[in-house]
Amino acid sequence: MSTTGKGGKAKGKTASSKQVSRSARAGLQFPVGRISRFLKHGRYSERIGTGAPVYLAAVLEYLAAEVLELAGNAAKDNKKTRIVPRHILLAIRNDEELNKLMANTTIADGGVLPNINPMLLPSKSKKTESRGQASQDI
């Protein structure tokens, strides 16, 4: 049992108290404790504040959700139910801000964006004119 002091509050942990992770406190799915450990062991700085891993986890979770949403839309446009690297590439390259953020990133098995120079495409106006002249010659 825990002892009580002058204030009447129990000192120490009570039987009903439960450990709550920093991710749960922040309302995040990404692991704040693991990111904190990576920041400490990575020697990015001599000291790491308590808010830094929470903020970084929130940013990473937001970016992951954004890419997954756009990739899901790309998969749905292609009538697929599974997201593959091609859908992730299409999602990133078709979004202006994500494309700028990941400009030098290569996605394995992503392929390339479909792009044909308009000059190489056959022009429709020439075909219709030539057909019209041929019928008048006869």
Curated annotation (Swiss-Prot):
Positions bearing N-acetylserine: 2
Pfam family name, one: Histone_H2A_C
PANTHER family, per the entry: HISTONE H2A
Domains: entry comment: The [ST]-Q motif constitutes a recognition sequence for kinases from the PI3/PI4-kinase family.
Assembly with partners or alone: The nucleosome is a histone octamer containing two molecules each of H2A, H2B, H3 and H4 assembled in one H3-H4 heterotetramer and two H2A-H2B heterodimers. The octamer wraps approximately 147 bp of DNA.
Function: Core component of nucleosome. Nucleosomes wrap and compact DNA into chromatin, limiting DNA accessibility to the cellular machineries which require DNA as a template. Histones thereby play a central role in transcription regulation, DNA repair, DNA replication and chromosomal stability. DNA accessibility is regulated via a complex set of post-translational modifications of histones, also called histone code, and nucleosome remodeling.
Protein name: Histone H2AX
Gene (UniProt): HTA1
